[in-house]
């Protein structure tokens, strides 16, 4: 997983353009090739209250100081250029240049990430420690950038089919539009790719799984404009993957209601993990903003390791390949696999016999003791099969993950002691 991050990291991405397309192709190749369906929508297209912006092309950018030194070199770090900057080729004095520079005073050794998708302006991002050293004099500024009004916005999706006869879907959404930042950008798509590969390898799938790779905000708006009715009808739970590759925490941003299946299964799965943090929808920040908006109202939560904005490296050059790790990415993947396994096993069951079942005559008492060490789990599980509690409810009472009850449930079903409601 980390190797894929290293391959993607240097690419200059934005909400449109060649870098985004190149990154989609790399993700597709990581899945075996020909897996992702890549789509486009024309610049200028109306999508709800928004308009798809002109496609951005960036080739080079730098500043030449009065001493002849090249600084803010785009080819050294693509964060140096204001993302979606207009082109410029001119000379100006320091005071005029300062109006187009962005830095972080309390993080003097970091390059900030700044965008201007919907307002045409030019600019550079610079370490504050370098900014304060700038001398009076003439500066040459050069940005080789264009905005193509006849361009496109790209996105990709993948539908992994259920092995059962159902149209119910689980949505996995992630974004791919940030340039060289590791946790905020690459961790979500990488975890999504490996999650999809894992799902494709399962022999049985209760749900259909819809994976969406988009530019943040405008991409989810575009996707909803194309698929809103279908998603509203068939989505049972959804998960936005963001900032899911570090080692420091596990985080959940709830839906507005906090009572959907997505809220329930994510909380059940993550709450016992180290340094778990739970947030309300007031702390939203990624594409859950669109999926959970009032007229859309999809059951979608956001799953992170350390939540966006809660680590000082966020939206700076410090969010680099040292901030994520193979272990962090694997932890994010495992968390999502557990969420899926808990969803897959979840049903509402009802007992088929009065009082406690006789486990001994069905050889369940001995078998279960050997396998689980305690007979209490099987009796407690049956005790809560009241056609109201689902498996997630019962597993929470037993302080175990729902998927750990899978074999027990199969035994009870085989012996016709429970039935699905």
Where are these regions (language model features)?
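N-terminal hydrophobic/helix-forming segments and targeting peptides
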Residues: 1-421
């Amino acid at each position: 997983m980390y190797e894929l991050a290293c391959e993607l990291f240097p690419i200059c991405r934005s909400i449109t353009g060649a870098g985004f397309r190149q990154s989609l192709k790399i993700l597709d190749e990581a899945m075996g090739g020909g897996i992702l369906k890549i789509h486009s929508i024309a610049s200028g297209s109306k999508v709800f209250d928004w308009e798809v912006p002109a496609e951005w092309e960036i080739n080079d950018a730098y500043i030449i100081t009065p001493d002849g030194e090249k600084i803010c070199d785009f080819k050294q770090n693509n964060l140096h250029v204001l993302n979606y900057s207009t082109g410029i080729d001119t000379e100006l004095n320091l005071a005029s240049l300062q109006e187009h520079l962005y830095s972080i005073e309390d993080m003097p050794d970091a390059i900030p990430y700044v965008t201007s998708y919907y307002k045409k302006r030019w600019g550079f991002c610079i370490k504050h420690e370098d900014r304060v050293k700038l001398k009076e004099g003439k500066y040459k500024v050069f940005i080789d950038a264009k905005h193509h009004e006849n361009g496109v916005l790209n996105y990709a999706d993948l539908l992994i089919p259920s092995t059962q006869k159902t149209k119910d879907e689980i949505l996995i959404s992630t974004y791919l539009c940030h340039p060289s930042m590791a946790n905020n950008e690459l961790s979500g798509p990488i975890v999504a790719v490996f999650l999809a590969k894992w799902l494709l390898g399962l022999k049985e799938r209760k749900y259909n799984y819809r994976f969406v790779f988009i530019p943040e905000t405008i991409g989810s708006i575009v996707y909803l404009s194309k698929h809103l009715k279908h998603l509203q009808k068939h989505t049972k739970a959804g998960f936005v993957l963001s900032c899911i590759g570090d080692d420091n925490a596990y985080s959940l941003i709830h839906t507005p209601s906090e009572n959907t299946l997505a809220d329930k299964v994510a909380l059940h799965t993550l709450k016992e993990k180290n340094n778990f943090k739970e947030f309300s929808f007031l702390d939203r920040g990624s594409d859950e903003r669109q999926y959970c908006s009032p007229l859309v109202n999809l059951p979608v939560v956001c799953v992170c390791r350390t939540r966006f904005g809660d680590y000082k490296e966020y939206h700076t050059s410090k969010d680099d390949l040292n901030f994520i790790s193979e272990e962090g990415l694997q932890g994010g993947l495992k968390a999502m696999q557990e969420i899926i396994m808990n969803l897959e096993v979840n049903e509402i069951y009802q007992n088929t016999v009065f009082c406690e079942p006789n486990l001994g005559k069905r050889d369940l008492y001995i078998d279960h003791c050997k396998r689980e060490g305690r007979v209490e789990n099987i009796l407690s599980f049956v005790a809560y099969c009241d056609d109201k509690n689902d498996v997630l409810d019962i597993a929470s009472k037993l302080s175990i993950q729902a998927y750990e009850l899978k074999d027990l449930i199969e035994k009870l079903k085989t012996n016709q002691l429970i039935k699905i409601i």
